[in-house]
Amino acid sequence: MTANAQQLQFIKDSIETIPDYPKEGILFRDITTLLDNPAAYQATIDLLVEHYQGQGITKVVGTEARGFLFGAPVALRLGVGFVPVRKKGKLPRETLSETYDLEYGTDTLEIHKDSITDKDKVLMVDDLLATGGTIEATARLIRRLGGTVTEAAFIICLPDLGGIERLEKEGIHSFTLVNFPGH
């Protein structure tokens, strides 16, 4: 097993699975156990930075809230700015909004209007890719501000839920550290 393969297995093993949360039939992938393990958290950040080093990224965008936990340290290590995308009403300056569909209803994300320019090459970071709706809305915000979406990075992917294909249809390539079956 290579060093990277060992690190990826270590990261995967540090993520606890909680059955029937938040509702029956769901296998919840809990990253708080990864965050509580400094070696696993460090390995996660190291692998993301290693993958994106030298790609000309000028901004890292993290989607509320767990995207902040991984996006901010990656931005810091890459030496670029970090931009939070938040739920509606949480940002203090003038914002741009994007509404997207949830399983039952809709939600709205916002970004500061002055946070991305047409010169920016943007990496999006979130903890988990399921259906892809949240990160797709994040990409629309970035593109509406003129930024170029380079890729979306995730710690966890649930491939059975179709998020990778949804993002590919929108021209968004993704990079994931670990996959889990099911939902």
From Swiss-Prot:
Superkingdom as given in the UniProt entry: Bacteria
Principal localisation: cytoplasm
Keywords: Cytoplasm, Glycosyltransferase, Purine salvage, Transferase
Subcellular location: Cytoplasm
Record-listed E.C. numbers: 2.4.2.7
GO process annotations (BP): adenine salvage; AMP salvage; purine ribonucleoside salvage
Annotated InterPro entries: Ade_phspho_trans (IPR005764), PRibTrfase_dom (IPR000836), PRTase-like (IPR029057), UPRTase/APRTase (IPR050054)
EC supergroup of this enzyme: transferase
Catalytic activity: AMP + diphosphate = 5-phospho-alpha-D-ribose 1-diphosphate + adenine
GO cellular component, one term: cytoplasm
Pathway(s) annotated for this protein in UniProt: Purine metabolism; AMP biosynthesis via salvage pathway; AMP from adenine: step 1/1
Signal sequence interval, chain numbering: none
One Gene Ontology MF term: adenine binding
Assembly and oligomerization: Homodimer.
Family (UniProt): Belongs to the purine/pyrimidine phosphoribosyltransferase family.
Task performed by this protein: Catalyzes a salvage reaction resulting in the formation of AMP, that is energically less costly than de novo synthesis.
Record-given protein name: Adenine phosphoribosyltransferase
Origin species: Proteus mirabilis (strain HI4320)
Gene coding for it: apt
